[in-house]
């Protein structure tokens, strides 16, 4: 995954824009940035591979499975059951990896 940015021009743009710009700005901690990214991807839907990757990223920096499940539960009234259930599946998949 760390070398994915080399796999084509869109991946290079993604790495340069998101991780070279947004993730280097001041004001939010890395844990807060990962959580915001996780929430946005969860609400957007249709991007489960990215949601799984960011669930794993969250867990790697201390936002554990139980915390992420609570976040999903908090967002449920706004994003609905299908996206919430998909997010929980992504969290569980990230735990298994």
Range-by-range predicted roles:
Residues 1-30, 60, 76-77, 82-97:
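Acidic, glycine/proline-rich low-complexity segments that act as flexible tails and inter-domain linkers
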Residues 53-55:
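Solvent-exposed, glycine/polar-rich loop segments of beta-barrel outer-membrane systems
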Residues 26, 39-45, 58:
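Short, glycine/charged-rich beta-strand-loop motifs at protein surfaces that mediate ligand recognition
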Residues 50-51, 87:
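Non-heme di-metal
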Residues 32-42, 51, 68-75:
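Short, structured motif recognition centered on aromatic/hydrophobic residues
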Residues 57-60, 66-68:
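C-terminal structured interaction module
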Residues 44-50, 81:
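Short loop/beta submotifs within extracellular cysteine-rich repeat domains
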């Amino acid at each position: 995954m760390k070398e994915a940015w080399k796999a084509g021009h869109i991946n290079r743009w993604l790495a340069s824009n998101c991780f070279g710009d947004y993730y280097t700005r001041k004001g939010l901690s890395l844990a807060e940035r990962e959580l915001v990214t996780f929430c946005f991807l969860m609400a957007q839907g249709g991007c489960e591979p990215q949601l799984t990757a960011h669930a794993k990223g969250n867990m790697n920096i201390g936002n554990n499975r139980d915390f992420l499940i609570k976040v999903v539960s908090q967002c449920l009234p706004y994003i609905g059951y299908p996206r919430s259930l998909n997010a929980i599946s992504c969290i569980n998949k990230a735990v298994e990896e």
